[in-house]
């Protein structure tokens, strides 16, 4: 139930797309969108109608990300009880000449035209790691921010970057094999389960590109902190050691300034919020430095 029109449509589309990619990646198979609202819900803070064409776009997005179809909730509006004003294919009027009914019909007609896509898969050379255990442990760790770690926001920043380049993304967990991927992103992977660092090391040794972030490799799968430095098991792979992490107030920002003549030609200053990792170089080269 994405909240279309609450923010820029492209931002909602990125959020929705990542959810689809996660569902597809859980089993590596096509999925069904079980509940698609034809118009507006009745339980969100504002019951916003989908603008003309938005139901079609939402349905086709699911197909493009590996879906097999879109099922609706609900077919017919009830006359009473808690969901009597929830969107439906057939409203209280009961006719087939409504705007919503025609939009639903258009989706069905299009699915017939593209039925050869049924059973096909999405090929991705990039994977992002999302781990529920790590998220739960991180959010209950009592530091470095007890309110607002913004984990999903960090995930979406990585995801948007890939999608803006037209790159398909699988959203995987620590048990997945990595052989088919060229790039692996690890946003805020607080918990490294047993053997995970070794798997990542092997991925890099075999030519894979690793992208990670602050607050990664901090604790094991019992939420006990690793000793002898973090990110655990990857300090030599990344060429850094995390020495401290600074939790910023909501109103506070830091900024990063490119080093003159840096290898990537970076020339813009970027702001950062919430968390700032202080690192010690152990073989890595500096591209940017923090201003504060």
List PLM regions with ranges:
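Carbohydrate-binding surfaces of carbohydrate-active enzymes
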Residues: 2-292
């Amino acid at each position: 139930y994405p909240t279309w029109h609450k923010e820029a449509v492209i931002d909602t589309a990125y959020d929705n797309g990542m959810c689809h990619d996660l569902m597809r990646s859980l089993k590596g198979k096509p999925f069904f969108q079980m509940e698609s609202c034809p118009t507006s819900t009745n339980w969100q803070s504002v019951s916003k109608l989908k603008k003309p064409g938005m139901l079609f776009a939402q349905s086709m997005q699911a197909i493009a990300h590996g879906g097999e179809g879109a099922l609706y909730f609900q077919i017919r509006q009830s006359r009473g009880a808690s969901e009597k004003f929830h969107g439906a294919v057939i409203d209280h009027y009961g006719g087939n000449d409504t705007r919503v009914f025609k939009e639903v019909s258009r989706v069905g007609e299009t699915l017939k035209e593209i039925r050869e896509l049924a059973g096909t898969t999405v090929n991705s050379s990039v994977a992002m790691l999302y781990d529920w255990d790590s998220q739960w442990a991180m959010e209950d760790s009592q530091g470095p921010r007890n309110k607002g770690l913004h984990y999903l926001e960090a995930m979406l920043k990585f995801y948007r970057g890939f999608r803006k380049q037209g790159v398909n993304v699988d959203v995987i967990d620590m048990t997945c094999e990595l052989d088919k991927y060229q790039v692996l992103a690890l946003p805020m992977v607080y918990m490294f389960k047993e053997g995970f660092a070794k798997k990542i090391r092997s991925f890099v040794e075999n030519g894979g590109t690793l992208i990670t972030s602050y607050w990664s490799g901090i604790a094991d799968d019992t939420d006990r902190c690793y000793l002898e430095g973090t990110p655990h098991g990857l300090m030599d792979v990344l060429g850094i050691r995390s020495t401290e992490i600074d939790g910023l107030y909501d109103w506070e920002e830091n900024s990063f300034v490119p080093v003159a003549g840096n290898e990537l030609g970076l020339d813009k200053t970027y702001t950062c919020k919430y968390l700032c990792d202080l690192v010690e170089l152990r073989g890595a080269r500096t591209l940017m430095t923090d201003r504060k």
